[in-house]
Amino acid sequence: MSWSFLTRLLEEIHNHSTFVGKIWLTVLIAFRIALTAVGGESIYYDEQSKFVCNTEQPGCENVCYDAFAPLSHVRFWVFQIILVATPSVMYLGYAIHKIAKMEHGEADKKAARSKPYAMRWKQHRALEETEEDHEEDPMMYPEMELESEKENKEQNQPKPKHDGRRRIREDGLMKIYVLQLLARTVFEVGFLIGQYFLYGFQVHPFYVCSRLPCPHKIDCFISRPTEKTIFLLIMYGVTGLCLLLNIWEMLHLGFGTIRDSLNSKRRELEDPGAYNYPFTWNTPSAPPGYNIAVKPDQIQYTELSNAKIAYKQNKANIAQEQQYGSHEENLPADLETLQREIKMVQERLDLAIQAYSHQNNPHGPREKKAKVGSKAGSNKSSASSKSGDGKNSVWI
């Protein structure tokens, strides 16, 4: 009998079962299949040919053997192995189909992406470089990364070790796994009870038969009864061991699920504020504790800037003097003098702006002349203000 096909199928179950399930599979292959294929056939190959009865009545010996063994021991154990392994094989087919479907869906999602790149944020330049260049660079900038490189990095990371129970739960196979485990347990109990009613716990050396067409009670003799009794007890022990492993696996799944739920609740109590807000894609920002300061652009010291400052100061002083003059009723002549001086200062300021806009000779004679004129105008205006109303004002 060739067991290679069933053995290959059961090896695939090893990849989708728990730690206890792997032990059960080892017992099934090493004891049941190996013992039945090697020891059972060699022990029971002559059970009917060596079954001898002390009668010459035709057909009596066959009828007595049928009464002694309604079903051959080897055929009974082969049928038991097939039925017990059937739920596991069905679970294997369902698991392979579902996992392949999940992998195909993930592959379609990856292929549907428009760009095979992954984006992550990286610091652009150091603070010292930005200060030297007097430029404000972005603190974080996106760096493109190939998906293949990202997958290689994920594959190189060590995966958490587990006994298969978490993998079954993550793949959504827990319900079907429990169902096949229950079916396997029911078959074990059924065959254990059937084996007891068919064969008992001992193979007797002789069997008394009184069936027709036997004329009277006759004695039939069995070959190697002690060896067959030992082998029968071994098969009882293997069946009981497999049944205990099934019960152990059910307890393992139940207590493991309870322990995982308690651990998850404990982690939620320890971290109450974790992940209480929805994830939003925010704009790039600096990491915590990262501060950057950019030096402001320094205003160049030029004569044009001095002229602008002088114009603003003179305008403020004139407004202040007009306010005081309105209350004290200053002479109209003083106002006319001030207006003429303001006009002269404004003309000189326009000349300075024109000279600066050309930028051919920023320190040329025109700027110097404008500078001297602005100083003379400011001195005259200050003198006139002193003679006008006696109020002190600062002129630039």
Swiss-Prot record:
Bias kind Low complexity: ranges: 373-396
Positions on the Cytoplasmic side per record topology: 1-22, 96-175, 249-396
GO cellular component terms given for this protein: connexin complex
Basic and acidic residues composition bias: residue spans: 147-156
Keyword check for Coiled coil: no
Transmembrane segments: 23-45, 76-95, 176-198, 229-248
Ranges in the topological domain labelled Extracellular: 46-75, 199-228
Compartments where found: Cell membrane; Cell junction, Gap junction
Family matches, as Gene3D superfamilies: Gap junction channel protein cysteine-rich domain
Family indicated by similarity: Belongs to the connexin family. Gamma-type subfamily.
Known function: One gap junction consists of a cluster of closely packed pairs of transmembrane channels, the connexons, through which materials of low MW diffuse from one cell to a neighboring cell.
Subunit structure, as described in the record: A connexon is composed of a hexamer of connexins. Interacts with CNST.
Name by which UniProt lists this protein: Gap junction gamma-1 protein
